[in-house]
Design a protein with these regions (language model features):
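N-terminal leader/pro-regions and domain N-caps
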Residues: 1-16
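A near-ubiquitous, low-amplitude feature marking generic local secondary-structure context
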Residues: 9-11, 20, 76
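C-terminal edge strands of extracellular/lumenal beta-sandwich accessory domains
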Residues: 24-25, 45-181
Length: 181
């Protein structure tokens, strides 16, 4: 699943540890052995098929602004669709499963630096707090450096098996709406 977005000053979701975080919410409908997440900024001329395009991306897709990506994969304590209410999501407990800053496996940014991010997380079935089970996850992203996060970004989430029913969105109300369809 590919998501194209635009991060800008003032539209962050949370300030945590002095950094402005933005979140993409991810519903995983089945047990997964592994998840991969990659993020790059800017999107530039990347060729992407069937991507989810946010309204902010559409409005700013020609922007040349980019940022040094830093990503986290976090799991909530919401394990079923019935628990995915606005109130529950807003007060959910989040456990960071993995994080990544700079990856040499990703394309360089326009400055020629390896400041794009890639992480792979393998489910740890022997530990219920680290297993990739059905439920609500989020991808947190910010910049490693202090300062504002601004620019287009491409986020891709994948698994080694087909997971029909995966939902990726920045908007919690859209997530709830899609879960209830």
């Amino acid at each position: 699943t590919t998501y194209l977005g635009y991060a800008a000053q003032g539209n962050e979701d949370e300030v945590k540890d002095g950094k402005k975080y933005y979140y993409l919410y991810l519903w995983i409908p089945a047990v997964a052995p592994e998840l991969g997440v990659r993020m790059m900024s800017p999107v530039g001329n990347a060729k992407v098929k069937n991507a989810i395009e946010s309204d902010e991306f559409v409005e700013n897709k020609n922007s040349t602004a980019y940022f040094d990506t830093y990503i986290t994969l976090e799991r909530s304590d919401i394990y079923n669709k019935e628990g995915a209410t606005l109130e529950n999501i807003q007060k959910a407990n989040w456990n960071t499963l993995a994080r990544n800053d700079d990856s040499g496996e990703m394309p360089t940014n326009p400055g020629g630096r390896n400041y794009n991010s890639l992480l792979r997380y393998k489910s740890q079935v022997s530990d219920p707090t680290k297993a990739l089970t059905v439920g609500l996850y989020r991808i947190g992203f910010t910049t490693y450096k202090t300062g504002e996060v601004e620019g287009t970004f491409l986020a891709e989430i994948g698994a080694p098996i087909k997971l029909p029913g995966v939902i990726v969105t920045k908007d919690i109300s859209k997530l709830i709406e899609q879960l209830n369809q």
